[in-house]
Regions:
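Flexible, non-catalytic linker and terminal segments flanking ANL/adenylate-forming cores
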Residues: 292-341, 426, 492-538
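N-terminal Rossmann-like dinucleotide-binding module
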Residues: 1-35, 41
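An anion-binding loop in the catalytic cleft
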Residues: 4, 23, 201-316
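His-Asp-centered acyl/peptidyl-transfer active-site segments
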Residues: 357-358, 374-465, 487, 511, ...
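Active-site-proximal loop/hinge segments within enzyme catalytic domains
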Residues: 2-5, 127-243, 309
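Alpha-helical oligomerization interface recognition
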Residues: 52-127, 131, 209
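Acyl/amide activation-and-transfer machinery of modular secondary-metabolite enzymes
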Residues: 27, 133-139, 187-197, 301-308, ...
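Extended, hydrophobic beta-loop-alpha segments that form or line the acyl/peptidyl-thioester binding
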Residues: 378-385, 462-519
Length: 538
């Protein structure tokens, strides 16, 4: 048996399983490249060198000599300079049968395609993504009830079994290479999503609808794509299961045949389908009897609307990773005398003055500076609403969590420069999928920041905020406040403080002043504090 040395790259537990096989067989692992803390901890416990992926990886591995590179559950493209370091070659694990389902999330797309067979593939890294020669492939039949969760589990098991066979070849005669027939290739991109944000088209057959729901069922694990959705009246609800049922009377497409705690039975393009596990977009359960009754007609999804939703969802998909991270770790503020959010907002507004001399991103930075001063926080989230937010029929947010970071000794000009790239990202991806909370177990709830910053023309604050500063196209400002959460006098004081900050920063000479030294009290409030509240009788 010919033992060899290796470097492993990946971010899931499958890497550990394969690494243990290597070590048990007497092979050497010269480095593990990962961003996953559990894998880093395991590697450290095993006494293995650990490197983070990303910029400079080839330089950091400059002194590492190895035979094989294994890419296992790794979703990032490996730099060619790193691949070139492997003396014998680089091998990738793919959770689908190549060339039929190349790219990402192969199990999901296989179920959506209603495939009869699936499998896993170990292949050489060469040419384009997932195009290299096949070394080992395990195929298996798919059950009719397969979900993304069950199919991923079966892929995991097949990966471990086939890796043992791959090692036998590498230890013996060498890799057995089989070129792919790329004419049979289907490639699934990172940003590919089911059509119409996975909103169910009831005109489809019951089998197609069931496949959509099963394909997006990841159990309690992270769902990287979307949740299946059903429009009921003016609400968009999530669906956990959809099973075609015979034995019901003929029904029109969208007609509700049954509404009980056991689910909704609705007419489709073939058999009626029973929808169960209804919840709102944050994953909170919804009883079917509260949203529809037998005899109701659910709205149908026409082709024009479906295309518009697909385009809207696609336009913001690239920003999802950033907003997901922000929603996982919200940085809230707690302004004094502001109550918790209520079910019914009552918006009032007041015009603001003092913004003369400020425009564009500097004006927005001045508003953020005011929030930093009145909240006393150096790091906080603002609900940012751009002037152009795509419409996905209730499937997208109309704001994003803009995380602001500053310090008392940071000059305003420096802060404003640092805020610009954050604003640019928010403009490129001004919304996130509202089912993101239900898809990610690490997001406990959708936390809307207390303060919003809006560039839209809507005559109200951002839903869920207590205060929203609205910047009109001509640069004029208004402060919208929810009077169910704070009194008029409190809003007036906050407005005066914002005007004081704007007035000060309207002078270019003041923009080099550290943020912590910018005045926020108006003359009236200052006199009240110094000579009103603090006055004493002799």
């Amino acid at each position: 048996m010919k033992n060899f040395s290796s470097v492993l790259i990946g971010n899931e537990s499958l890497l550990i399983q394969c690494a243990e096989r290597l070590l048990q067989g007497g092979d050497q692992i010269h480095a593990v490249v990962t961003r996953h803390p559990d894998i880093r901890a395991w590697a450290a416990e095993r006494g293995l060198r650990v490197e983070a992926p990303g910029e400079g990886l080839a330089d950091r591995l400059a002194g590492v000599s190895f035979d094989w590179l294994f890419s296992i559950a790794n979703l990032s493209v490996i730099p060619q300079a790193v691949l070139d370091k492997a003396r014998l070659g680089a091998i990738n694990f793919h959770d689908g049968p190549l060339p039929r389902h190349a790219g990402l999330n192969a199990p999901v797309w296989a179920i959506l395609a209603r495939e009869k067979q699936h499998g896993v593939t170990w292949h050489m890294i060469a040419g384009g993504i997932d195009e290299g020669d096949i070394l080992k492939q395990h195929l298996f039949d798919m059950a009719g009830s397969e979900t993304a969760l069950t199919l991923n589990t079966r892929c995991y098991e097949a990966a471990i079994e086939s890796f043992a066979e791959l090692l036998s070849d590498l230890h013996g005669p060498g890799p057995q290479r089989h070129p792919q027939d790329l004419s049979q290739r289907t490639y699934h991109r990172r940003l590919d999503r089911p059509d119409a944000g996975a909103l169910i088209d009831l005109a489809r057959t019951g089998e197609e609808i069931g496949a959509l729901v099963r394909a997006l069922d990841h159990g309690h694990y992270w769902n990287p794509l979307s949740c299946p959705k059903l429009r009921i009246g003016d609400r968009v609800l999530l669906v956990s299961a959809a099973v075609p049922e015979s034995g019901h009377p003929a029904a029109a497409v969208g007609e509700v045949l049954e509404s009980t705690m056991g689910g909704l039975v609705v007419g489709t393009g073939s058999l009626p389908v029973r929808f169960t596990g209804l919840s709102d977009l944050e994953g909170r359960p919804v009883c079917p009897t509260t949203v529809a009754q037998a005899g109701d007609r659910l709205p149908l999804l026409d082709a024009v609307t479906a295309r518009a939703i697909t385009q809207a969802m696609t336009s913001v998909a690239d920003g999802e990773a950033r907003w997901r991270s922000r929603l996982q770790s919200p940085e809230g503020i707690d302004l004094p005398l502001v109550a918790a959010a209520s079910d019914q907002s009552r918006w009032r507004s007041t015009s603001l003055t003092g913004a003369k001399g400020l425009e564009g991103d500097e004006l927005l930075a001045a508003v953020a500076t005011w929030v930093a001063r009145v909240s006393g926080k150096a790091v906080f989230d603002l609900a940012y609403q751009d002037k152009a937010v795509p419409d996905a029929q209730g499937c997208l947010s109309n704001w994003v969590p803009l995380q602001v970071s500053t310090s008392a000794d940071m000059p305003f000009a420096e802060f404003a420069r640092g805020l610009t790239p954050l604003l640019e990202h928010a403009r490129r991806a001004p919304a996130f999928a509202l089912d993101l909370v239900a898809r990610d177990p690490q997001i406990k709830a959708l936390t809307v920041p207390q303060v919003g910053l809006s560039l839209s023309g809507e005559a109200a604050g951002i839903a869920g905020t207590a205060l929203t500063v609205r910047v009109a196209a001509d640069g004029t400002l208004s402060l919208w406040y929810d009077e169910s959460r704070l009194e008029e006098a409190t809003a007036a004081t906050l407005a005066q403080r914002l005007e004081r900050v704007l007035e000060t920063l309207g002078d270019p000479a003041a923009r080099t002043t550290p943020i912590g030294r910018l005045p926020i009290m108006s003359a009236t409030e200052r006199d009240q504090v110094l000579y009103g509240w603090n006055s004493t009788r002799c």
